[in-house]
Design a protein with these regions (language model features):
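Acidic two-metal-ion nuclease catalytic site recognized across multiple nuclease folds
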Residues: 2-30, 192-267, 271
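Conserved non-catalytic scaffold segment of RNase H-like nuclease domains
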Residues: 10-144, 156-177
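Acidic, Mg2+-coordinating catalytic module of metal-dependent nucleases/exonucleases
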Residues: 115-135, 156-158, 162-229
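A substrate-engagement module of RecA-like helicase motors
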Residues: 256, 270-278, 336, 343-470
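Conserved pre-motif I regulatory segment
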Residues: 265-312
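Walker A/P-loop
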Residues: 305-327
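Conserved two-lobed SF2 helicase motor
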Residues: 469-481
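SF2 helicase catalytic motif II
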Residues: 478, 492-496
Length: 496
């Protein structure tokens, strides 16, 4: 898999170039103490619920630098039979676990192997909950590092942070839904993550390591060690934002009002896009032409050509999204303009963003960029993010405050590598994090008094004609998101 195909749409080229060299650098770069005597662990269970299911396999590896110096592997005898679907997934049978140690015996042996060293697991909350549900499990380790959350900090632009996806991308051992194979894969991915963290802006590791030092946080020692490799580096959020926006800058779009007429495909070309073997069929191999969808697409086409309006009512199963996306995309590409689409819900916007539009852009062979624009509370306020990262505000969550620090780190990393995007795509546990600590509302936005206002305005002027800004508290009224049209700018979704 190519890096270009593994990152989210709109990833800056400098980020792609950095990701492309990670696997090679991970083979030679050393990280001293933070990769000595660490345990990589994975488990297999009879299901997902710690209340209703049990351990059936535990695997762990002790790392010293780039080498595995010791292994721990055991089946676990459950009190219940292994469900057929689990056997199908893992290939672990009831015969395999018939003579295995009990959960208490297996976890006690694991505790002896780990010896209190830090434990790395992908989605560590899952593995830890099963281990600690067993008597003596809390003695395994006090330090659990979730490589899933760490991957979102280290590699914020990846399209997926599944272990299997990253292992395949970076040439690590493959994942097979067996604990020992998954441990082998994670051993390789772990070093890639450490290298990727060093590619984040200088000073960011120190900023993260120094956040709210009173809060126990398993990632703090990692960030502190990496910060020590560049002592004295100062992190600037405004400078990081300026760099990523500059790298993302492209030629301005044409103002549609300045065009005497839109260049559009003919009605026959639009019909051909929906015919067998046409554009839509290439996007969806099982697609079958629908007369209602073609009729709707032609109405949208005619409205664009004539500069008139249409109100179209279409039932379920017509394929409305593709009926309007194809003519709009052709209008945007052929005229170098930005087209706005107002969806009824953010869920529909996400469906277009992550499903239809990537497929459409691929079949159009480039020339189509797209991004989503939602309401205020879907985007981070840079001013609040800066204050939170400096420890200038209290953590207000009633749950584990470490989750808030992890959210700060994830958002910070994403901001430094992304010109646009929204909070919903970052995998943050909002049940444990107070979202208003990171977002703003119209009544509280500092606007021109905001220390990031110059960045916001620069990004906005660029974005209005090319793509919508994602990381700003809107300061230009015509770009505000509303639930009903206002001055012609009810923009929930933008392609261009």
């Amino acid at each position: 898999m190519l890096i270009e195909d593994a990152v989210s749409s709109g990833t800056p080229q400098f980020v792609i170039d950095s990701y492309a060299t990670l696997a090679d650098r991970a083979k030679t770069q050393s990280f001293g103490l933070i990769e000595e005597d660490v345990i990589v662990l994975d488990t297999e269970t009879t299901g997902l619920s710690v209340q209703d299911n049990e351990l059936i396999e535990i695997s762990a590896a002790r790392l010293s630098g780039r080498e595995v110096i010791d292994r721990f592997d055991t089946f676990v005898h459950p009190k219940q039979l292994i469900p057929a679907e689990i056997t199908e997934l893992t290939s672990i049978t009831n015969a395999d676990v018939a003579d295995a140690p009990s959960a208490v015996e297996a976890v006690a042996a694991l505790a002896d192997f780990v010896g209190g060293c830090p434990v790395i697991a992908h989605n560590a909350t899952f593995d830890r909950s099963f281990i600690e549900s067993v008597k003596g499990g809390v003695n395994v380790s006090d330090i659990w590092i979730d490589s899933l959350a760490l991957s979102r900090i280290a590699l914020p632009r990846l399209a997926s942070h599944k272990l299997s996806f990253m292992a395949d991308l970076f040439g690590c051992d493959s994942v097979s839904h067996r604990a020992n194979a998954d441990v082998d894969a994670l051993c390789g991915v772990w070093r890639v993550l450490l290298v990727a963290l060093t590619d984040l802006p200088q000073g960011l590791m120190a900023r993260l390591a120094d956040m709210h030092p009173d809060v126990p946080w398993s990632y703090r020692p990692i960030f502190s060690f990496l910060a020590g490799q560049n002592p004295g580096s100062i992190f600037s959020l405004s400078a990081a934002r300026a760099d990523v926006l500059k790298a993302d800058r492209a030629d301005d779009r044409v103002d549609a009002d300045e065009l005497p007429v839109l260049k559009m495909p003919s009605r026959e070309e639009i019909e051909a896009d929906y015919a067998p073997g046409g554009l839509v069929n290439r996007m969806y191999p099982t697609y079958e032409p629908r007369d209602e969808q073609i009729a709707m697409a032609l109405e949208v086409h005619d409205a664009l050509v004539t500069g008139t309006h249409r109100v179209i009512e279409a039932g379920t199963g017509v394929g409305k999204s593709m009926a309007y996306l194809v003519p709009f995309a052709e209008a945007a590409r052929r005229n170098n303009i930005t087209v706005g689409i107002a969806t009824k819900s953010n869920n529909l916007a996400d469906q277009l963003m992550y499903h239809e539009l990537p497929k459409l852009a691929e079949q159009l062979n480039g020339g189509l960029s797209f991004c989503a624009l939602k309401g205020y509370d879907h985007y981070p306020c840079l001013r609040k993010l800066e204050r939170m990262s400096r420890g200038q505000v209290e953590i207000t969550t009633k749950r584990d405050p470490a989750d808030t620090l992890t959210a700060v780190a994830v958002i910070m990393a994403y901001v430094c590598q992304s010109a646009d995007g929204d909070l919903d795509s970052l995998g943050i546990r909002w049940r444990s994090v107070n979202r208003p600590d990171f977002t703003t509302a119209s009544r509280e936005c500092a606007r021109r008094l905001c220390p990031f206002s110059l960045i916001n305005v620069w990004s906005t002027v660029l974005a209005v004609v090319r793509r919508m800004p994602m990381w700003w508290s809107p300061t230009i009224p015509c770009c505000s998101v509303t639930s009903r049209p206002r001055a012609g700018f009810c923009l929930r979704f933008v392609i261009g």
